[in-house]
């Protein structure tokens, strides 16, 4: 196939649709016979994923790699920032943690400058550029994604991910604007006007995203935008709700319906303050037997058939908050009255007798009593376990810190045995269990086990749900949607010019 330039999707702001458009083009290029790969130099997200070789990257790049039909790799997202508080993030470089950074130190004092880790000098800009170079030697084209807005001129000197990265990659840049939030003319024109003359030349096209209504009403707007900016509008993509791509940000979770439904098993996912890896529940949410909702309301929790405690980036902080807001007591009471409780990763730790952090890896709290639903104890340590796993129920992945063992003289009752012979999780009964395995709910065998105590509540049972096949269908639907409204031939011309 002909060698194409890298393409980079940048935005007028956050949540304009860069990640989804990048996934769409990963699938489009694959359908057209190319071997694309995604790349985002630096990502900030709690929703991460374990690569096949046991390292950690942002979930969006894992999704984009899946759309491209290739295994994910740390070179696709060499630098990941995982917020631990309002001001501090864990820095993941090439899939492994290298320490915590205060936001001011990272963005204002250091950013791309050299820092020291255990007497080793780290140059973040050099690291991400080298990762890109390795990736571009293997795949064609590279589908790059920027971060946030390209107009944050106060952070330009430390920017690793937007136009400075495009310059290194010699990428053709496409600016994405979100018309649904309003002000698209100002945001697109302003984003371009605030760039240096050198960087403005990199922007080869504009895509207007999330359009609602009659497309013909924007014909004049499209012409005016092209005249204002001197850059072609390559497409106007309508807003959609019928295509389901795993999301990286949890903005929409609280908007999902919480009302109980008759004829289905009602599953409450507890909305922790530091909830992470909420894509654990995407497959369960699509299961026709289930009505899944997110809540931290004690009344909602008390009415659920199944309560799931999800992963968290700050176990002790969320445990403290659960006790403060009454959710801990509501979960214990609901379980006593017949509800099932499942904990995943940090949620598994919460279900134990205690969580200890004697060396303060998470914060200032030394120890807190857990919910007492499982006879286990967890001690936080500095080692992060990151790997993909196989177990009796199927596949998944681990991303966690802390060691969990039976409490006192409690016997070991693992939920499953992993492919390397290690035991995972703890099970008291079919209505009380925990696991470290993210993605376990993607496996039909485990979902059947979880739902079995409430099978008599299901009024209509359809065909078995194949989540992997569903995801493939969604990538194809997304590609078809973008092909319909974006000038793909023009983009190929730009990338070949």
What feature does the model see in each segment?
Residues 1-333, 340, 382, 391-497:
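Flexible phosphate-sensing "switch/lid" loops adjacent to ATP/NTP-binding sites
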Residues 345:
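Catalytic nucleophile serine of serine hydrolases
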Residues 348-349, 441:
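Short active-site segment of divalent metal-dependent hydrolases/proteases
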Residues 352-404:
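A conserved active-site-flanking secondary-structure segment within enzyme catalytic domains
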């Amino acid at each position: 196939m002909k060698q194409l330039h890298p393409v980079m999707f940048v935005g007028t702001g956050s949540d304009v649709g860069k990640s989804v458009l990048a996934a769409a083009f990963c699938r489009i290029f694959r359908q057209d016979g190319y071997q694309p790969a995604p790349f985002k130099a630096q990502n900030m997200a709690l929703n991460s994923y374990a690569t096949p070789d046991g390292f950690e990257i942002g979930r969006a790049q894992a999704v984009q790699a899946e759309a491209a039909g290739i295994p994910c790799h740390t070179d696709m997202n060499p630098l990941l920032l995982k917020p631990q508080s309002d001001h501090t993030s864990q820095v993941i470089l090439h899939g492994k943690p290298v320490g915590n950074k205060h936001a001011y130190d990272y963005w204002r004092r250091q950013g791309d400058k050299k820092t020291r880790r255990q007497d080793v000098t780290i140059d973040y800009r050099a690291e991400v550029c080298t990762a890109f170079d390795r990736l571009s030697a293997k795949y064609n084209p590279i589908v790059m994604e920027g971060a946030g807005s390209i107009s944050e001129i106060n952070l330009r000197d430390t920017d690793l991910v937007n136009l400075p990265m495009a310059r290194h990659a010699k990428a053709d840049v496409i600016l994405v604007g979100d018309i649904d939030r309003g002000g698209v003319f100002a945001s697109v024109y302003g984003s371009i006007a605030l760039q240096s003359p050198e960087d403005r030349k990199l922007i080869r096209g504009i895509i207007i995203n999330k359009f609602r209504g009659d497309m013909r009403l924007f014909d004049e707007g499209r012409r005016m935008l092209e005249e204002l900016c001197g850059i072609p509008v390559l497409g106007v993509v309508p807003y959609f709700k019928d295509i389901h791509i795993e999301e990286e940000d949890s903005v929409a979770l609280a908007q999902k319906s919480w009302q109980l439904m008759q004829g289905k098993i009602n599953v409450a996912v507890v909305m922790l303050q530091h909830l992470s890896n909420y894509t654990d529940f995407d497959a369960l949410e699509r299961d026709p037997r289930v009505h899944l909702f997110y809540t931290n309301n004690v009344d909602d929790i008390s009415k659920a058939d199944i309560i799931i405690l999800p992963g968290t980036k700050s176990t002790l902080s969320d445990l403290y908050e659960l006790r403060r807001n009454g959710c801990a007591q509501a979960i214990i009471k609901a379980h006593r009255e017949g509800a099932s409780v499942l904990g995943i990763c940090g949620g598994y730790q919460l279900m134990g007798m205690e969580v200890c952090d004697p060396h303060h890896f998470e914060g200032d709290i030394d120890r807190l009593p857990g919910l007492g639903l499982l006879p286990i104890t967890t001690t936080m340590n500095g080692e992060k376990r990151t790997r993909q796993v196989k177990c009796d129920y199927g596949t998944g992945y681990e991303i966690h810190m802390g060691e969990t063992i039976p409490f006192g003289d409690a016997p070991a009752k693992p939920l499953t045995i992993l492919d390397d012979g290690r035991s995972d999780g703890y099970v008291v009964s079919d209505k009380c269990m925990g696991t470290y395995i993210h993605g376990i709910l993607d496996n039909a065998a485990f979902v059947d086990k979880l739902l079995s105590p409430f099978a008599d509540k299901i009024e209509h049972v359809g065909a078995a749900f194949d989540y992997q096949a569903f995801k493939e269908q969604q990538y194809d639907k997304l590609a078809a949607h973008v092909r319909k409204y974006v000038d793909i031939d023009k983009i190929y011309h730009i990338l070949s010019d």
